[in-house]
Swiss-Prot record:
GO biological process, one term: L-tryptophan biosynthetic process
Name of the molecule in the record: N-(5'-phosphoribosyl)anthranilate isomerase
Listed pathway(s): Amino-acid biosynthesis; L-tryptophan biosynthesis; L-tryptophan from chorismate: step 3/5
Organism: Halorubrum lacusprofundi (strain ATCC 49239 / DSM 5036 / JCM 8891 / ACAM 34)
Keyword Zinc-finger appears in the UniProt entry: no
Enzyme superclass (EC): isomerase
Gene name linked to the record: trpF
EC code: 5.3.1.24
A GO term, aspect molecular function: phosphoribosylanthranilate isomerase activity
Taxonomic lineage from the root: Archaea, Methanobacteriati, Methanobacteriota, Stenosarchaea group, Halobacteria
Length: 214
């Protein structure tokens, strides 16, 4: 069964709904250079993630301008893990891991398997996403799940499938790609970063149903 991350949380009520639905991880977005209704400031990110209970992974999703700034954010916000988007080098990922002893997830474009292979065993997990030109996710666009599954088979690092997932298609995506985890943000929203709690619950349930939609 694929693990589930509910991302782009901006309110305590939405965070609690994700946890109550059984999400394995929750994500808060801060310091990204793109316009997003899901972005919160670092203080709000710290406040939200401080309420995450044990056994649920509190994840900071960010695009800082340097590895040093990523370390600063980790020390300020204190998440369990950081998910990085944008352009990074293997040495920068190693630096962040060494300085903070936090798990580092790296988002890579689904159309760039060579980059995923470059960071295999460097990042703690690879988020295979549909990214825009800046490397940001949250596009709401799907990609070839079977090809993502073939890539995952070649990698050692766990693969998190993202990009255009919803409660209605996540079971099919899991069946096709067999990822370690799935990640959703816009696919379970009402509007402006506010989550649809029913969609969140259905997404978590359906992620565990490879052949059947709830």
């Amino acid at each position: 069964m694929a693990r589930v991350k509910i991302c782009g949380l901006t309110r305590g009520a939405d965070l609690r709904a994700a946890i109550d639905a059984g999400a394995d991880a929750v994500g808060v977005i801060s310091e990204v250079p793109v316009d997003s209704p899901r972005e919160v400031d670092p203080a709000t990110a710290a406040e939200l993630l401080a309420d995450v209970p044990p056994f649920v992974t509190a994840t900071l999703v960010t695009m800082p301008d340097s590895a040093e700034r990523a370390v600063e954010l980790l020390r300020t916000i204190c998440p369990d893990a950081i998910q990085l988007h944008g352009e990074w080098t293997p040495d920068e990922i190693r630096f962040i891991r060494a300085e903070t002893e936090r798990k580092v997830l790296l988002a890579v474009d689904a159309d760039d398997p060579a980059r995923a292979e470059e960071f295999d065993r460097v990042a703690d997990a690879l988020v295979i996403d549909s990214t825009d030109d800046s490397g940001a996710g949250g596009t709401g666009e799907t990609h070839d799940w079977e090809r993502a599954g073939d890539l995952a088979d070649r990698l050692t690092s766990p693969v998190v499938l993202a990009g255009g997932l919803t409660a209605d298609n996540v079971a099919e995506a899991v069946r096709a790609a067999d990822p370690f985890a799935v990640d959703v943000a816009s696919g379970v929203e009402l509007t402006d970063g506010r989550k649809d709690h029913n969609a969140v619950a259905r997404f978590v349930a359906n992620a565990g149903r490879e052949m059947e939609l709830a």
